[in-house]
């Protein structure tokens, strides 16, 4: 019995990161929903298909079928003739909640700019669920979003993926079982922030040295815990009786010291945490991919990447997504060499993973229009980009980037019923989200104020003006 208790302690102690990942668990519960069939719509499924004059049926929070089929007799029926239906829109780069509205110093909680390596901080611990930006984004069809720390540091901390539902806590918004991300930054930001303080890094080579030193420490941390587990397992297998129990207990009393920073970095090296890297220049992105090869981890997504078009083939070959702006560049030197065809060119190679992101509390409200701009510029350059492909830039590719493509981002059977009904083609400047569903529950209606959530912070502040 004593020995079993010791081994239970071992199981708890030796799983690096498990304690962290189980901390602050998601309490998200889908809202009540009803079986719903949407009739006669133009449907963009998110996986490359377009269905005209088609139907969509979901029940118990999941897509049941798309195209045609049988629905329950008690189903709610929505006639969407002349309208378009897409998966819920996903923004992979948002700071809602960590830089909430109103924009005052007291709300500046996105950058722990006190050291170049702050992998120990978690963005969710700064999220203010009352940020009015969440409901504004919902009105634009945003059903899921990743909240990231800022880009002042080499390692900025963990990101979190949220369901865009009204809630009093971030835990109640937390996307169930979505993997954590790690925000990293290359280029001007870290070297500017710390170079001004006359400390490292102050150059790009200092940036890279800082990453590599941290990865070495993380690998040593993994090795220390693995060696600890090996010794305990060996002790348990070879020793018996009171003397063996004493030796086992002594070994258990000497675990490596727990380190929150290194737990996060170790999570990346073990493949449990996805790297999201702020990076603009093509040469730097290639350097980062080489470094990932050196330490045996995968870069998930480069964010911003205004020069990603220069290395589109390499990104595709390495399985790296590019989360990009449609037409935002030139605001600093490393952002100088941007082109409006960037997204379309990153999307072009086989295996290319282009994403339209916002990094803006305003842009997130019109992410469909940002995708439309990128599609238009690609078409003008002679590329064939139908709507059914471009919609993936803000749905299925975004879900892939966040590690939730098996749960949301497409309208196929068994996926979460995250759905938007648009008044017309979502790539039109006149498009508006009429109705939004998350896990099959209607959470927004353009024509019903009862389904237009507002933040608790705004209650009592909105004044109706008589016509």
Residue ranges, per PLM feature:
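Bacterial N-terminal signal peptides
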Residues: 4-15
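C-terminal cap of metal-dependent C-N hydrolases
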Residues: 41-44, 400, 412-456
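Histidine-rich, glycine-flanked metal-binding segment
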Residues: 21-34, 43, 47-86, 103
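His/Asp/Glu-enriched, well-ordered alpha-helical/loop segment
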Residues: 27, 32, 101-102, 108-114, ...
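Divalent metal-coordination and catalytic microenvironments
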Residues: 41, 56, 61, 82, ...
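Extracellular/periplasmic ectodomains of large secreted or surface enzymes and adhesion receptors
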Residues: 20-33, 435-467
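Polyanionic/metal-chelating signatures
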Residues: 133, 138-303, 432, 438, ...
